[in-house]
A protein has these predicted regions:
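Bacterial N-terminal signal peptides that target proteins for export
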Residues: 1-9
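Catalytic-core segments of enzymes that bind and process phosphorylated/nucleotide-bearing substrates
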Residues: 12
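N-terminal signal peptide c-region/cleavage motif recognized by signal peptidases
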Residues: 15-18
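N-terminal soluble domains immediately following signal/targeting peptides that reside
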Residues: 21-110, 123-187
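Intrinsically disordered low-complexity segments with strong compositional bias
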Residues: 110-118
């Protein structure tokens, strides 16, 4: 089976980045850096708790605006300038995807009355965990010059430690970006 590096990134997330960090652990983010020929793919996943402060739908317009501001902080990482990388594609989970219409507090519209009524209604808002996911794809003119990637948004989320899987021409590896670290050396 011939699987491209780019295609492998979602698989890494699905398997907990090869067990580098347990799936959905508050305070721990997962990232991947993959180089395939001249293509650089960067992926990031973090618990919403560490990005928004909560893992539930916004309860007001003001809260919705605040959540969007927090999501907007997650900007494209910066590959080393010498590599000559140009951003080709960016996918960041947006607020509408995290909390689809009708996924909020409208129980009358989507409540199944055939289930056990002994549950706690608060569980609807707090029981499941959600993650922010982002992927950036770059084309690089001088991929051999790629010696670092800076993740500027990590400075905005000091509660996070980020486990990074590396899939590079020189080999595979793992690194940790501790709270406050934004620059990931690749050498």
């Amino acid at each position: 089976m011939n699987l491209s590096i780019r295609g492998a990134i979602p698989l890494l997330f699905a398997t907990g980045l090869a067990q580098a960090a347990p799936v959905h652990q508050h305070g721990r983010a997962e990232a991947a850096v993959a180089v395939d020929d001249a293509t650089l793919t960067l992926s990031f996943r973090a618990p919403l708790m560490d990005i928004l402060g909560v893992e539930r739908a916004p309860e007001s317009e003001a809260e919705s605006h605040h959540f969007q501001e927090q999501l907007d902080l997650v900007v494209a990482p910066l590959p080393a300038e010498a590599a000559g990388c140009t951003l080709q594609e960016e996918k960041v989970t947006d607020l509408a995807a995290l909390f689809p219409a009708g996924d909020g507090h409208h129980h009358a519209d989507d409540h199944d009355h055939d289930h056990d009524h002994d549950h706690d209604h608060d569980d609807h808002h707090h029981a499941h965990h959600q993650d922010l996911e982002a992927t950036w794809t770059y084309q690089c003119d001088h991929i051999a010059e790629l010696n670092a990637v800076t993740w500027p948004f990590l400075a905005d989320f000091p509660s996070l430690t980020t486990e990074v899987i590396l899939l590079l021409p020189s080999g595979q590896g793992a690194r940790t970006l501790n709270s406050g670290d934004t620059r990931l050396p690749l050498e």
